[in-house]
Amino acid sequence: MKAVILAAGTATRLRPLTDTVPKCLLPIGITTMLGMTLDNLLQNGVKEYVIVTGYREEQIRDFVAARYPGLDVSFLTNTRFAETNNIYSLWLTRELLAGQTMLLLDSDIVFDPGIVALLLHSGHENCLAVLRSKTLDTEEIKVRTDSAGAIREISKEVDPSTAFGESIGIEMFSPRFVGRLFGLLEQKIVLRKQVNQFYEAAFQEVIDGGESIFAVDVGSLPCLEVDTPEDLNAARAFVGSTSRFAKNKRWP
């Protein structure tokens, strides 16, 4: 199993905070979003990592080297970060993920480590974390499921009234699914030049081709995607009020 963390974007909605710092390294209490993600994965026994960087990538590499010496991590650079979306960053990992189970995470999520445990112990080879405890609108990536919990539709365009919940950007896929996914990404990126989509567009095509991804409800476990200054303030308030994040041996 390898964890893939996508951290290439410029985070324009958080400017000027991200003028000189990548979003995943903005301070969140005594940590950062990337630091929290790595800590949560390590707590769940994940040992191998792939981080896709782009914007201000040297800061991310320096951060990981300083805070996580000895971590088994490979870095890949999305040199086209200013003109592509996360589907392209994911495609860059194809050689390192061949034959591997993949845990895929966006780098701008503040979340409870129990969410990773839910996926690992869900009983599903292919699944993603879904938040149901919020009002949905057009901004979120939403999922619609069948009666067995398999996802039938995933996109921002899913009707909120029929949606099971919001996909929060944490997924787990089997080696077989990973092979199918990267085969499709090769077509989308190389042949169709669809480099500026969300990776959920590829998930949808794999689902339409007969594969299943199951929705795992995170229940009351907290999670928050940070896109705006308001989100960042909410994330900082959450971390500041949660005792288990108050002390970490990796932080001063």
Q: Where does each model-flagged region fall?
A:
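Short catalytic helix/loop segments, enriched in acidic residues and glycine
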Residues: 20-35
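Conserved alpha/beta core of the MobA/IspD/sugar-nucleotide pyrophosphorylase nucleotidyltransferase superfamily
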Residues: 1, 164-252
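Conserved beta-loop-beta/alpha segment of the NTase-like Rossmann-fold superfamily
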Residues: 68-141, 145
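Conserved N-terminal catalytic core of the sugar/cofactor nucleotidyltransferase
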Residues: 2-5, 31-101, 191-193
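Conserved beta-strand segments of alpha/beta enzyme cores
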Residues: 24, 72-74, 150, 212-214
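N-terminal nucleotide-binding beta1-loop-alpha1 segment
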Residues: 1-18
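A structural signal for short hydrophobic beta-strand segments in well-ordered beta-sheet cores
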Residues: 25, 143-145, 215
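Conserved core of the sugar-phosphate nucleotidyltransferase
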Residues: 112-189
